[in-house]
Amino acid sequence: MQTAQYIIELLKAVFLGIVEGITEWLPISSTGHLILVNEFLNLRQSKDFIDMFNIVIQLGAILAVMVIYFKRLNPFQPGKTAREVQLTWQLWLKVVIACIPSAFFGLLLDDWMEAHLSNFFVVAIMLVVYGIAFIWIEDRNRRVEPKVTDLARMSYKTAFYIGLFQVLSIIPGTSRSGATILGGIIVGTSRSVAADFTFFLAIPTMFGYSGLKAVKYFIDGNTLTGGQAAILLVASVTAFLVSLFVIRFLMNYIKKHDFTVFGKYRIVLGIIVLFYGAVKLIFG
């Protein structure tokens, strides 16, 4: 690949990292957006690499959670009281419990989902369906007080239920954060508790999923060139830096606002994607 072309590929990686850093945490589907953006940016790489790339760059976004919440998530943090250490371990146990459903169904259905549901029409439908769900749930939520307003008081059973909602995010266009935040609100948590738990749940979930994708990539006989590694690294670092801002933005945003605006965005985007997919199918 010529130098000019390679620089363009790196610039594309930066843009994709920005998209990942924004959409991983907002309930609007990061994978769905990456699939769409790749249509227009068209990374000059193999399909196997792009499929792996779309998942593995999420590690950069996940690292941002670990940096922002390091003290809260670290049971060995100096200065923590015995009670705080206990609560930290309990939090991690809740995260592990919530991971069980998606780990089971993810391993079972990942290949089938990728083969049959990674297309414009599925992404469009999921964008619209969950957009409507967010608007409806938030409208209902105005008349219902949340039962859980403190993550420390969230039960293990509630954590498991949220984990069941995370299974829905296996379908492209759903949004992992969208499914778990929506699930948290449905089972009675406040928006802030649902968002916090979504961030923490992302750590083992996305590390596991990214690792699975990377392993499959190499098992299928693919290799990673130095240029591809650089593209992956640039996108991941960009996703990390953007995520640092977006996570803080979202936590401040939900103190005064609900998720209705994201529901409306999903519906509009879903209609656009559906139209684009139809045009592409008809005219090629």
UniProtKB/Swiss-Prot annotation:
Whether DNA-binding counts among this entry's keywords is no
Q: What is its main location?
A: membrane
Q: Which UniProt keywords apply?
A: Antibiotic resistance, Cell membrane, Cell shape, Cell wall biogenesis/degradation, Hydrolase, Membrane, Peptidoglycan synthesis, Transmembrane, Transmembrane helix
Q: Which GO terms describe its cellular component?
A: plasma membrane
**MF-aspect GO terms:** undecaprenyl-diphosphatase activity
Q: Which reaction does it catalyse?
A: di-trans,octa-cis-undecaprenyl diphosphate + H2O = di-trans,octa-cis-undecaprenyl phosphate + phosphate + H(+)
UniProt subcellular location: Cell membrane
Topology relative to the membrane, per the entry?
Multi-pass membrane protein
GO BP annotation list? cell wall organization; peptidoglycan biosynthetic process; regulation of cell shape; response to antibiotic
Which EC numbers characterise this protein's activity in its record?
3.6.1.27
Membrane-spanning ranges: 6-26, 49-69, 89-109, 117-137, 167-187, 192-212, 227-247, 259-279
What the entry lists under InterPro entries is as follows: UppP
Is rRNA processing a UniProt keyword of this protein?
no
Q: Which family does it belong to?
A: Belongs to the UppP family.
What else the UniProt entry mentions is: Bacitracin is thought to be involved in the inhibition of peptidoglycan synthesis by sequestering undecaprenyl diphosphate, thereby reducing the pool of lipid carrier available.
The UniProt function text for this chain reads: Catalyzes the dephosphorylation of undecaprenyl diphosphate (UPP). Confers resistance to bacitracin.
NCBIfam families recorded: PRK00281.1-2, PRK00281.1-4, PRK00281.1-5, undec_PP_bacA
Task: Quote the protein name from its UniProt record.
Answer: Undecaprenyl-diphosphatase
Q: What organism is listed for this UniProt entry? A: Streptococcus thermophilus (strain ATCC BAA-491 / LMD-9)
